[in-house]
């Protein structure tokens, strides 16, 4: 068949794909990469809420802020305890010249300035132990302060190490290796009109218990007149004859049947680009190596859904008998060979009515001929 191969970075050359009244930029709840575009505003005590959930707050930080925060935390603890050591030495009289006071035992040896106190705090916290500066038995409160510093800084180091490991090992990074097709297409599959997307696992390690679902977000007005800005409707997807736990070892094609139960049943080639909705697609899976649950997300708006197109096959069989996934074709679509679903619903009804009338006349003619033959 004659096919038109094209990239989804430019719109298809079809008249029904564009219109003079279309919006070029539509607001979307979720970006193509799966990040939320919702801004949380005017929340009382939001910073206090973040501090109460400090673990999640620190993990969600960007790496540059996290490293800056932790470096500043260490420097501040060294300096803070250094100032306290300096104050203890000042009160005890350790900063006076040693010649002026005979038989004087300082609280901390070789700490006669703020710089020396800072270095003693740093050496104690990092357990460097050069041996020049050391604490004595002269001041019990200095000994207590040293113990408190080691306990507090140990807890800080445990927290820092835990957040670093949690950020590195979280399944979000695994979810980023799941690739969705940039566009969706509407075509026929097994005689049914379907909305189709492609999903691929970019790693060789498998994903267990994969479940793909969709949420249709659009404005809805209730019978009482209430206007719901983002009404959510469930959009079910299936692979071939299976709807649960697909084997995502190769790029897979997921289908949503546009039947009477579908929230997208009113779509036509003419009104597709005029609709106001967003289709959010979620893929939940378990990582094989860590058993952690990950979720990958994307969304599609009407401008990213192409009517009458189909995806170019990605998987092929090589000469040596191995399956090959060519990702250079992953974003390629072509015009569907089946043109029976290009017409609008009204045109389809007219054709069906015409066929019914012709069939009715044929049956009447056969009945008349049969009656005449019997006579």
Swiss-Prot record:
Recorded topology in the membrane: Multi-pass membrane protein
GO biological process, one term: regulation of monoatomic ion transmembrane transport
Region span, Disordered: 1-22
Record keyword Aminoacyl-tRNA synthetase present: no
Stretches assigned to the Cytoplasmic side: 1-60, 166-375
Molecular function as annotated in GO: inward rectifier potassium channel activity
Catalytic activity, as annotated: K(+)(in) = K(+)(out)
Residues flagged as site, Role in the control of polyamine-mediated channel gating and in the blocking by intracellular magnesium: 157
Extracellular side stretches: 88-113, 131-139
A GO cellular component entry from the record: monoatomic ion channel complex
Motif extent (Selectivity filter): 127-132
Intramembrane region ranges (chain numbering): 114-130
Ways its activity is controlled: Channel activity is regulated by variations of cytosolic pH; reversibly inhibited by acidic pH values. Inhibited by Ba(2+) in a voltage-dependent manner. Inhibited by Cs(+) in a voltage-dependent manner.
Cited Pfam families: IRK (PF01007), IRK_C (PF17655)
Annotated InterPro entries: Ig_E-set, IRK_C, K_chnl_inward-rec_Kir, K_chnl_inward-rec_Kir1.3, K_chnl_inward-rec_Kir_cyto, Kir_TM
Domain of life: Eukaryota
Membrane-spanning intervals of the chain: 61-87, 140-165
Gene3D superfamilies: 1.10.287.70, G protein-activated inward rectifier potassium channel 1
Functional summary from the UniProt entry: Inward rectifier potassium channels are characterized by a greater tendency to allow potassium to flow into the cell rather than out of it. Their voltage dependence is regulated by the concentration of extracellular potassium; as external potassium is raised, the voltage range of the channel opening shifts to more positive voltages. The inward rectification is mainly due to the blockage of outward current by internal magnesium.
Family to which the UniProt record says this protein belongs: Belongs to the inward rectifier-type potassium channel (TC 1.A.2.1) family. KCNJ15 subfamily.
Subunit-structure text: Can form heteromultimeric channels with Kir5.1/KCNJ16. Interacts with PATJ.
Record-given protein name: ATP-sensitive inward rectifier potassium channel 15
Organism of derivation: Cavia porcellus (Guinea pig)
Lineage: Eukaryota, Metazoa, Chordata, Craniata, Vertebrata
């Amino acid at each position: 068949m004659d096919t038109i191969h094209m990239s989804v970075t430019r719109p298809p050359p079809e008249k029904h794909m564009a219109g003079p009244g279309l919006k070029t930029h539509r607001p979307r709840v979720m970006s193509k990469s799966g990040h939320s575009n919702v801004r949380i505003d005017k929340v009382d005590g939001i910073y206090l809420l973040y501090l109460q959930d400090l673990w999640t707050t620190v993990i969600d930080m960007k790496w540059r802020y996290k490293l800056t925060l932790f470096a500043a935390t260490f420097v501040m603890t060294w300096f803070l305890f250094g100032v306290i050591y300096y104050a203890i030495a000042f009160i005890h009289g350790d900063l006076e010249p040693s010649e002026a006071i005979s038989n004087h035992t300082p609280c901390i040896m070789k700490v006669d300035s703020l710089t020396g106190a800072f270095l003693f705090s740093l050496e104690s916290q990092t357990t460097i132990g050069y041996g020049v500066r050391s604490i004595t038995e002269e001041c019990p409160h200095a000994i207590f302060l040293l113990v408190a510093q080691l306990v507090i800084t140990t807890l800080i180091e445990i927290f820092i190490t835990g957040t670093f490991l949690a950020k590195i090992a979280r399944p979000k990074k695994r979810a980023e290796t799941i690739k969705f097709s940039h566009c969706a297409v509407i075509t026929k599959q097994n005689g049914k009109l379907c909305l189709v997307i492609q999903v691929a696992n970019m790693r060789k390690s498998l994903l267990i218990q994969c479940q793909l679902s969709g949420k249709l977000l659009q404005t809805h007005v209730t019978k009482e007149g209430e206007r719901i800005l983002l009404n959510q409707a469930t959009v079910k997807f299936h692979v071939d004859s299976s709807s649960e736990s697909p084997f995502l070892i190769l790029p897979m094609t997921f289908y949503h049947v546009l039947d009477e139960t579908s929230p997208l049943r009113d779509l036509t080639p003419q009104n597709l680009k005029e609709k106001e909705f967003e289709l959010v697609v979620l893929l939940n899976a378990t990582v094989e190596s860590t058993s952690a649950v990950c979720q990958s997300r994307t969304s599609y708006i009407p401008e990213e859904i192409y009517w009458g197109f189909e995806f170019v096959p990605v998987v092929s069989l090589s000469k040596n008998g191995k399956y090959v996934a060519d990702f250079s074709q992953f974003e390629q679509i072509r015009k569907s060979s089946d043109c029976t679903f290009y017409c609008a619903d009204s045109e389809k009804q007219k054709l069906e009515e015409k066929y019914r009338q012709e069939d009715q006349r044929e049956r009447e003619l056969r009945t008349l001929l049969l009656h005449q033959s019997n006579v």
